[in-house]
């Protein structure tokens, strides 16, 4: 029986490249001249710290970061940006987390979405991934289209296809 896994993974090398490109872009922008603004990638915590002098500039920096991530084929929904900014001294900062893996609540929503579609497939949660098994490839392709079309707030990839 054909099957595949639904996962949510981010290539950290691509994230590193996007952060480096955003930092390089920061040096060429005239509105950030002589302004202490920065991007810091923390690969252990899987987070990106964005810091600048004002909250408006932090929002601009986040837009630059999203643009560079999308050019590297990483969806903007892979970033979890908190509503509140940290303000210390004269710098504002935001610690944007990268979403890796499928949490159990998100996996349950995904399973419910697939089961409500009435496609003839079996769905199992296996740790931080979801396994989908069906009798035909057409059913599996229907599930893939359904998951791509659903807005679940997180990017999903499909891997481990078996016939």
From Swiss-Prot:
Mind telling me which residue stretches traverse the membrane in this protein? none
Can you supply one Gene Ontology CC term for this chain's record? cytosol
Which Cys residues form disulphide pairs?
A: none
Tell me which CDD domains the record gives: YajQ_like (cd11740)
HAMAP family in the record: YajQ
For this UniProt record, give its keywords in alphabetical order, as a comma-separated list: Nucleotide-binding
Family assignment? Answer: Belongs to the YajQ family.
Q: What does this chain do? A: Nucleotide-binding protein.
Protein name in UniProt: Nucleotide-binding protein Spro_1084
Q: Which PANTHER family would you find in this protein's record?
A: UPF0234 PROTEIN YAJQ
Q: State one molecular function term (GO).
A: nucleotide binding
Q: Name one Pfam family in it.
A: DUF520
Please indicate which superkingdom the organism of origin belongs to.
Bacteria
């Amino acid at each position: 029986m054909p099957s595949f896994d639904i996962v949510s993974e981010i290539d950290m090398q691509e994230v590193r490249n996007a952060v480096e490109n955003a930092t390089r872009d920061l040096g060429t922008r005239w509105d950030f001249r002589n302004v202490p603004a920065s991007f810091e990638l923390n690969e252990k915590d899987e987070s990106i710290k964005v810091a600048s002098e004002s909250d408006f500039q932090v929002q601009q920096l986040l837009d630059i970061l999203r643009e560079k991530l999308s050019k590297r084929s990483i969806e903007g929904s892979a970033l979890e940006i908190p509503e509140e900014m940290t303000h210390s001294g004269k710098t504002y900062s935001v610690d944007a987390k990268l979403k890796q893996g499928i949490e159990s609540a998100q996996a349950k929503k995904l399973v419910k979405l697939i089961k409500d579609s009435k496609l003839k497939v079996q769905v199992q949660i296996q740790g931080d991934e979801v396994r989908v098994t069906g009798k035909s490839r057409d059913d599996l392709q229907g599930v893939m289209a359904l998951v791509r079309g659903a807005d679940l707030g997180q990017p999903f990839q499909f891997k481990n296809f078996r016939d």
